Structure formats: C-alpha cells, structure tokens
C-alpha cells in the first residue's frame, strides 16, 4: 500500500489557537509524523466569541446570518488563519503540498445541540469555516463537516477522538496492550474504551464526561 499523508486541523472551544497534525497511513497503520500550532490573535478570539453568541441566539439557523457582513468576515478571517497555519507548517517542515492527500478540517464549533439534550426538538450542530477558501489558499483538497451525518442518524456527533483512538489501539493490541482506554483532555474531556466482540474484532465506545480545560 502506498503511504498516504494527511493533515488534521482542530480549533477547540477555548478559541486560543489552531492545532494541526501530519498523519501517515501505510499498511493498516496510522502514525502521527509532525505537528504545529498557531495562536489566535486576540481580535479574532473576540470576533469568534461574538459570532458564537449570535449563532446560539439564532438556535443554529445560519440562514439568518448569511447576509450579515460581520459573520462572513469572521468566518473568512478564521479560515485564513487556518490556511496560514498549514502553509507555515509546510514551509518550516519541508513537506511539499503535493505530498499531502487532503486536509481534515473540523471547523470551529459554535453550537452543538445533540439528541441527548434536545428533549425531542430537532437536533443540530454548527461548525463554521469556509472549506472552499481553505482549499484555494492551501492548494490541497479539504474534507470537512464530520458531525452532521451522525446527528442526522440519531447520534451525538461527539466526541470525534474515539475514531483516532481506535487506530492507535490496533497498534497497541499488536504489542500486547489490550483492552485500552484513553482520556482526551480538551475543553471538554472525553473517554474512549476499546475492547473486543465475540469474534475478536475491536469495538470502540466513547463519550464526553464534562468540562475540563476551561
């Protein structure tokens, strides 16, 4: 199998910076190769806080904000910072953009209203970010919107970390470390537990456990 390299991009609810990781996939193994972080300028943090508050006031209805110049300005400024982070990383690390198959772009969560708290009302999730602009500014294909399908299927849309932890667990299992549990300590802490079913296949469960890095 030809090695595939991708860059994952995360901006957490703390609104303090952009974190990226370069990950390699080869022969069924996943390896984190390098990473880079860039802090938010204070002005952008303030804009994103205002944007998040407005989206929550509208109950996630983005159509009410599409003609709002401030909202589009904030989203594009945020996306430009993400692109700058990727481009700076590539320049400093020596990796060519042609070596990167795709960017995984989570976007900035501004509201999250899953079934567990919706109380029978329509569930939704809102992550902002201009994927087309990011692709244009970096020259790399962008994969985005990771939570919506799960919400529409009745899931919680969170956490995302168990998917990555499942890959790591496969490598640990080969080394005799299994079953395994992971604690992911972000703005909201979450736990992943990887066990096996009766057929010996890996089974992953994950859930948020509460506020952590506030």
Show where each model-derived region lies.
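Short acidic/glycine-rich loops and adjacent helix/strand connectors
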Residues: 1-214
